[in-house]
């Protein structure tokens, strides 16, 4: 983990990588957050070894200590499955000064790629129990989560490196692992789609700048290339501040 203690008077941000990755995948984003004046906790956790509920308990001591070391709000930024882990963590160990949550390519409603691969022994052996929680059949742990009553901003990607998953497995638009439609979450404060791949989201210049914008303002910055939030029917508005294919990370 990395804690930049020079910024302990500021807000803090917990960064959670996706399945099969490490904190290194979030390092570029972390540096940008630090340059914006935020304190960071960039965790590596055993994403392939345990289900989400147990992973939450693994990361809790470090996050609790980090929260006590800062004076401001405690925000979360999760890439892919890291966003799901953030949701489970907040439900079980809600910080007293909870800030905002940004999700990058998170399969909030599952992924058809995981549906396709879940019966594969190779998939099960490599991605472990958490990999089986990424399907479109709502996992029990995720189904029991309360509605979000905190500001969640979601960045989805619309480019893919895998043409098979992009064209034949996932509804379009998608990032090669998660469709834009399945990245959405009931009660989210804001949502944007950018021209980035799933794996590339934590490195993407626009995704990084939009993450910083949401953590600061509770909403994403709009340009002519970024249309207003379009929620599907039934999604209530919430206040901005209140193996050729791979599974989502």
Segments predicted by a language model, with ranges:
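Helical cap/lid subdomain of alpha/beta-hydrolase-fold lipid enzymes
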Residues: 91-247
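Serine-dependent carboxylesterase/thioesterase catalytic core
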Residues: 7, 13-19, 23-24, 28, ...
């Amino acid at each position: 983990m990395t804690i930049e203690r020079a910024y302990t008077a500021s807000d803090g941000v917990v960064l959670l990588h996706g399945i099969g990755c490490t904190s290194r995948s979030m390092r570029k984003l972390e540096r940008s957050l630090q340059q914006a004046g935020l304190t960071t906790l960039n965790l590596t956790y055993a994403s392939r070894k345990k289900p989400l509920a147990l992973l939450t308990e693994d990361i809790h001591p470090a996050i609790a200590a980090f929260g006590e070391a800062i004076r401001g709000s405690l925000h979360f930024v999760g890439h892919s499955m890291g966003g799901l882990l953030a949701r489970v963590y907040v439900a079980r160990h809600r910080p007293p000064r909870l800030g905002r949550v940004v999700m990058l390519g998170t399969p909030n409603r599952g992924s058809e790629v995981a549906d396709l691969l879940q019966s594969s022994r190779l998939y099960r052996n490599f991605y472990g129990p958490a990999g089986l929680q990424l399907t479109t059949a709502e996992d029990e742990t995720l189904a029991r989560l309360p509605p979000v009553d905190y500001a969640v901003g979601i960045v989805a990607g619309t480019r893919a490196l895998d043409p098979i998953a992009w064209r034949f497995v996932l509804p379009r638009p998608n990032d090669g692992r998660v469709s834009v439609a399945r990245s959405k979450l009931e009660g989210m404060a804001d949502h944007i789609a950018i021209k980035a791949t799933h794996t590339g989201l934590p490195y993407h210049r626009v995704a990084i700048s939009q993450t910083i914008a949401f953590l600061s303002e509770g909403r994403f910055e709009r340009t002519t290339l970024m249309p207003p939030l379009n929620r599907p029917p039934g999604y209530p508005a919430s206040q901005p501040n209140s193996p050729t294919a791979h599974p989502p990370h």
